[in-house]
Amino acid sequence: MNDLRLEFVDSIASIGEEQWNGLAGKDNPFTRYEFLWALEKTGCTTQSTGWEPYHVAVYGSKLEAATQNLVAVMPLYQKTNSYGEYVFDWSWASAYQNYGLSYYPKFVSAAPFTPSHGTRLFTDESVNKTDIAQLIFEKLQEKAESLDASSWHILFPTKEENELFEAIGIGARTACQFHWFNRDYSSFDEFLQTLNSRKRKNIKKERQKIAERGTTFETIEGANIGPQHWDIFYQFYQSTYMMRGMQGYLSQDFFIEIGKQMPEQLFMIVALDGEKIIAAALFFKNSEKAFGRYWGSARDYQFLHFETCYYQGQEYCIAHKLKSFDSGAQGEHKIQRGFEPITTYSNHWIANAGFAQAIHNFLDEEKPHIERYKEEAASLLPFRKES
């Protein structure tokens, strides 16, 4: 392979579905073309929202070939805020401001609005991934200088990518999430038997309260999610944000679009009072994992969030033999429900030498605190001790 050529493109449509998915695949719902294009097409990732597409496309030709083929892609956005990232750098932005400098724009490689780890740099088997990463890094440094961008942030890459990017000079950061693992359970009751008596009783009590209220649940696979479901779901979705004085990042058109373009990776769990939907949660899935992402309800019903978003999701994983369940960022209340702490990763390059050193020192100091937090969280897990 020789004559590598890198382009920054302002729309994933410039690369195209076949080309992008040819490298990225479709198993990860948040990095497949359909998801990223739906965000862009419906106005969720645009310059006005602070997520301007700036995707990376690398082309190369084999010695005997006359034309160049796409050999690598990477999602990239030029950002003018830090919303929808879930790796928090607001304090860094404030520090820049205190010194009369601008932290924005910055570059971010991520699945927008999605705190879920996965591959971020997709390469053809004919090229060396480290070489491609180095090329992107070099070109991005040049682009950052020309656009006066402060930094580049790679959010929720795999552990292997985190190490690769760190090796070429992009600082590494860790954080913690809580995921549930399906250890070949045949039923939810079998899972409960792995918990200590007190936690098992607490979960049963919570579920019993929901049942006594007469609430029932229905799982709607993606192809069967109709306009009426999207309407009520979107009302709930926005109400969740409104309670915090915010507006949801995503439009109803976005949800309708992914419902059309990738229904096989979606399912919705709705809670019913008689025939009336009183809550809804939208999940994604791939061949091994479920991802709980968005939820809302008509009002605050005790334990309904836990049932709809966690217990129903766990039951779905058991029934469909999915190996794990990523229910989103944060949430220490998940620990007592069997969600285990896992490490997540990010990488950060800072253009300003002074700030780069300060942030590097911060990351070094932060890492043992994250490890200690993860250990403490693991010590609180409700599983029975092996005798």
Task: State where each predicted segment sits.
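N-acyltransferase acceptor-side catalytic subdomain
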Residues: 1-387
